[in-house]
Amino acid sequence: MVSLRDNIEAQPLSHNRRIRKNFGHINLVADIPNLIEIQKNSYEKNFLQLNIKDSERKNKGLQSILNSIFPISDSSNIANLEFVKYEFDTPKYDVEECSQRSLSYAAPLKVTLRLSIWDIDEDTGTREIKGIKEQEVYMGDIPLMTKNGTFIINGTERVVVSQMHRSPGVFFYHDEGKVHSSGKLLYSARVIPYRGSWLDLEFDAKDVIYFRIDRKRKLYITTLLRAIGMSTEEIIKFYYNSVTYKLVKNKGWAVKFIPQHITAHRLTSDLVDADTGNILLKAGQKITPRLAKKYFGEGLNNILVAHETLIGKYLSEDLRDPTSDEVLAKIGEMITADMLNVINALKIKNVNVLVINPQSGPYIRNTLFADKNQDREAALCDIFRVLRPGEPANIEAAESLFYNLFFDVDRYDLSEVGRIKMNSRLELNISEEVTVLTIDDIKNIVRVLVELKDGKGIIDDIDHLGNRRVRSVGELIENQFRIGLVRMEKSVIERMSAGDVDTVMPHDLVNSKILVSVVKEFFNTSQLSQFMDQTNPLSEITHKRRLSALGPGGLSRDRAGFEVRDVHPTHYGRICPIETPEGQNIGLINSMATYARINKHGFIESPYRRVKDGCVTDEVVYLSAIEEGKYKIGQANSKVNKDGKLQGEFINCRVEGGNFVMVEPYEVDFIDVTPMQVVSVAASLIPFLENDDANRALMGSNMQRQAVPLIKTDAPFVGTGVEGVVAKDSGASVLALHDGIVEQVDSNRIVIRTLEQKVDGSPSVDIYNLLKFQKSNHNTCINQKPLVKVGHYVKKNDIIADGPSTDNGEIALGRNVLVAFLPWNGYNFEDSILISERIVKEDVFTSIHIEEFEVIARDTRLGPEEITRDIPNVSEEALRHLDEVGIIYIGAEVKAGDILVGKVTPKSESPITPEEKLLRAIFGEKAFDVKDSSLHVPSGVSGTVVEVRVFSRRGVEKDQRAIAIEKQQIEKLAKDRDDELEIIEHFVFSWLEKLLVGQVIINGPKQVKVGQTITTEMLKGLSKGQFWQITVEDANVMNEIEQIKTHYDEKKEALDKRFATKVEKLQSGDDLPQGALKVVKVFIATKHKLQPGDKMAGRHGNKGVISRIVPEEDMPFLEDGTVVDIVLNPLGLPSRMNIGQILETHLGWASINLAKKISTLVKEYKNKHIGIEQIKKFLIELYGENINSILERPEEEIISFCKKVSKGVHFATPVFDGAKVQDVKDMLKLAGQDPSGQVKLIDGRTGEYFDRLVTVGQKYLLKLHHLVDNKIHSRSIGPYSLVTQQPLGGKSHFGGQRFGEMECWALQAYGAAYTLQEMLTVKSDDVNGRIKTYDSIVRGENNFESGIPESFNVMIKEFRSLCLNVKLEVTSS
């Protein structure tokens, strides 16, 4: 077999990768996990379980819901509908087709159901199966996720944001002393299920314990304990220990000595050993717990106490008369002086009492005696009355209600997570399958609550990430599915009961519309299903990794306090402490940290390296916030020697509660994987983040998401090394699916012959159609450019094409520009930015924005609307851009007001003139009465038409334009098919040739003779089809040729079939909305050059607006004549404390000067002044070890590498592990510059040096999506508000402004009465005055009369609404 690697002539694509000088010291052991896997895993793996065989599906997601809802039985148990399996059909349209046709990308869900019908014998009640029907039922279209983790809903790309909510389980709190005036802590507990009723337990100020269900009226806790079946005795025995007082004649009582119950106090009586009679301590002496332990250790077991000590104690069992066995006092009663006399009189020798001491209070005993309910029935009825007030309480209803509340699987679900949390908090060992409350749970919740009150244990921290979990896409949609299926279940039962069950099939019972509407509603209207932020690739990734505390079942903005929004120690490595919105959502919407992932229970995990005996291993362990609390964790920058041993006497470690301790190396359990794991993706792209103030870093990471993709992309010279990962995972770039060799490349597509051979040995072909000038959700431009050349060898997952805002496989949100920090004539006051004309001239910050305009031709009452060029009363000039159908040409330059698509709408019949009557009589036809309803370019838009799409309803004849577009698309598909076939044919026939050459012919076409030996020349004379006609002697070769032929035919047939399906889809017409005959979409691309008023920003939160564009000759310049591009205000730094931008500027200055040095060396090498060794030496000095792979290559490749860095050397300074100030100075020295990073600068206007040295360097700046073109507008004539008759406000309403309050003061100050009157009446909201003034201007007169402004009438109406009848009476003077 031929090895395809024989013809790899060209270099591998990996040779083109950008190499950065990396300042990081910490070796990365773990790669950054795929940045969008949180979405894909949750939906595809956990919810849909796509591509998994039915038998291997786990009971989770869709499978678990279907299992829990089915089987469904009717009321009489005759019919039973069971679930067998489910599967998905292939979607009708692919992602691209759905985007273009405004459809949802979804796959039909087919569920196999089995309907069993039973026969029930009325006499005996025995059941026999009467019949079984199994059928596949269509359950609606379920949205599928695209490969980038998004959904296409009605043609737009949407993202479902993950939600942070409180984990199910039990939580204990106190009120922090806020409720009671004394500041006493009132403890409470709350059981939060995944779904079901909430149970609250609470102490009141009198230390009585109550409970509430769903925040209704409170009841005594003992009512709940009785309701779960506990008697008084069981309650007391469960919560209290008992101690026995034994009578000692004439001395008192002997009781067991328990040192744990002793607190420090002065004795009121002697401490006497009951066994020996020795006095250990005299009355008035002090006893302490330590002393008590000492006595206990020395053998003190029982002590003697006085007779009256029993008074005030509580009985731990019924007190009975020893002779008659009569109950004298009930369990739990307090011993009084009278009762003690009875005990003495009856000579009762042993009395059992409850152990109640300073460490444990009598709360439950007191509650028991306050509660009037004495048995289970009374307790259940009491609960029933609270939950169902007004309904008569009987025991059956009460029992059923109570059972349904907490113990019914269908109505109450703690979820597996809730059960795990419950078990760990209450120290129980109940199976994880039990997801309802148990009696043990309730008993132990009360126990823990009482212990907390007694000072044992600590309350829970709600903001701890062990108590908050993430609900991702899969789980959110799972909950919607459950709602839909429960609704459907009701309709199935109704249909079962209504119809004749014997004749019914499963599909007759199931109404899929119920399910579909619930899912649709979620995707279209849920607060968590959001329009994807598609400004640039970073904003897409960030949106998919966002965690929101808002949404259904979450918090609301108004009620969220400071604690929820604050950074918590457990956020470390899980949630980014920097990236969150400014404003009212601060802290409620967060971003996942770079290395974080979500475990199967929904808790966020962070990776750590294991440390064994003080030695750091490469084993990476992911820990959740709960697990992390058990260990001591060191920082990533702890010093480690070559053998991996931690150095230093003590290591700084994090322990539970976010505290830091110093421990010895062998005590350390884990260390961080990398310092970058603390921050999110956006923050990890900011170099020198460690030198910036947190507030500015927050702005920096937020503004990177608003950067507009530029025409010319440029990766930052000073990066952090994460740029490549972001570009790859964002889906903006195109990745190779398999190893292969590039066969064809143009700007629209890449064809790669793969090297992964199939069973038959023939290659498959990957064709990548690139996106050209597509509109994103935010009207920015998506355009992909190939990075490969023909003959390149690519590996799987190599980046083969750049997308928007990417450059050579790295994210490139802005441009590197030469910046000087200096004041310039006040034009950089208040963060304004001064830019050179070169930036505009060379399109440095020019971006393309694409607007979409749509026109629909509908079928109206009066007849169909028509798309046509034939529009009444429109000049030929206005139609110049339209084709014969009335649709604009691609490439036409349009401005506001131009017609894009001509459309006419039928008008209602108007009375006809005699002339028209005559015409109709002569020509015998009705003159078509239509009005112009064409699509015009709206105000403020101009540009070039880049694409037109025409959609026609099925069955409506297509116009010429639609046919032309269709033909173009079919040609494109045919070319893809032909190219793929050509590559396969080339391979197959070259293989055939190798098999045939040298073989002897038995039979063949006319051109060959039998018995000849085949040569290459002989085969050249044959056509491809004749190869198959040759028969040779060797049977093995013939077998192989047969196999090749079969595989070749199969492949050809598959290709033809795929092509035919796609063509059929194109030709079949479209599913358009109700009443629409034709839809035309026109896309206009606009080039936005940089102009004053546009907002720009750096990566450190330094933002500003362009104030002026200055000619190059007036800008400051360097001594070598280089003109500075941008001048920034040095005062923007000190107070903002984002020093990172200065370090970036210095390192950027080193970058371009090192590049100049390399270029000089290359020139000298070409002129033969130096050898390649000197260049190698300099590169090693600059790059260190990173460069070894390049230096091993041939000389030409080293020189070609040097040319690539001729504009600037690329650095990577990872977050918290990057270049220090000394490293920057070293680089400046290596570049031959002053280590201060400052230079002499010359004023372009005067030609003189500035007085002081100026900081100059390369800085990375972004153009933000706040363009002045989209903000400024002017109004001439426009709409008025109905109530006030004043212009509307805002650009979207084409609004204006009226003369305001302060403007009135200005005219009043000048006493300009008539001007003021004019401004407030005819020029504002005096409607009649306006009309009259207009008339007089038309007539050429100059006089006008002012009336009453409408706002005055509004004021009078408002007075009247307050019952004040104000009238305006005009009296003549």
Swiss-Prot record:
EC number from the UniProt entry: 2.7.7.6
Assembly and interaction partners: The RNAP catalytic core consists of 2 alpha, 1 beta, 1 beta' and 1 omega subunit. When a sigma factor is associated with the core the holoenzyme is formed, which can initiate transcription.
NCBIfam families: PRK00405.1 (NF001616), rpoB (TIGR02013)
PROSITE patterns: RNA_POL_BETA
Domain of life according to the entry: Bacteria
Protein name: DNA-directed RNA polymerase subunit beta
Its biological purpose: DNA-dependent RNA polymerase catalyzes the transcription of DNA into RNA using the four ribonucleoside triphosphates as substrates.
SUPFAM superfamilies: beta and beta-prime subunits of DNA dependent RNA-polymerase
Organism per entry: Rickettsia massiliae
